[in-house]
Amino acid sequence: MRRVILVGMLLGLAGVGWGQSADSVAPMGSMSMPHGAGNMSAHMMLSATRPLKPGDQEKADAIAAAAKAAIAPYVDYKKALADGFVIFLPNVPQKIYHFTNYSRGIAAARKFDPSMPTSLLYEKTTDGGYKLVGAMYTDRQRAPEVELDERIPLSVARWHEHVNFCKAPAGQETAYFGKDAKFGLLGSISTEKDCVAAGGTFQPNLFGWMVHVYPFEMDRKAVWSVDRDDDGDMKGLKM
């Protein structure tokens, strides 16, 4: 969860986005949060789960297989860099590092291509390198759940969005952090009215839908886990 909070907050500050707004989402609700993250449930949304339909698991398996083939050439992270992927926050300690190709993100807002994930997911190695573990697919902010389900069955995978972000006014950036945080994805402010009153800039949705896939895993549930990179702070949300 710490990585999700930091990535979401800083992407919001940078103004990066795939689309415009959100549709048909289910709030995370009550869960274990890191210290100072008691307001996180107001800033994170998950797609609703759906009953497993005939063919859903097979479709998800096929997408995972396509993802595995697509990312296999990037076992060497240096090739990813050479091919236009950019490490997000390389100097910030994270459990999972996103190597993102923003051109792919733009294309994904228009069409889903399992062979072209927006981001490659790596774990840092003890020698300072990176180990390839998965990929991330994205979709536009306006995408309804029926579209997400068409891309990857919601009975198997859950997409997530970062929402209700209040950007702090200049000089109040320290209020992003701590148990009394007001702004950002840790903040107590989660409505436009309260954000404007505090002098902030409100963003209802930071950058659209995202879903992680870990195609090298043998367990189907682990392949579409929603909390592999969350240091155990999202217990109960694994698929």
Regions found by a protein language model. Give the residues of each.
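Bacterial N-terminal signal peptides
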Residues: 7-15
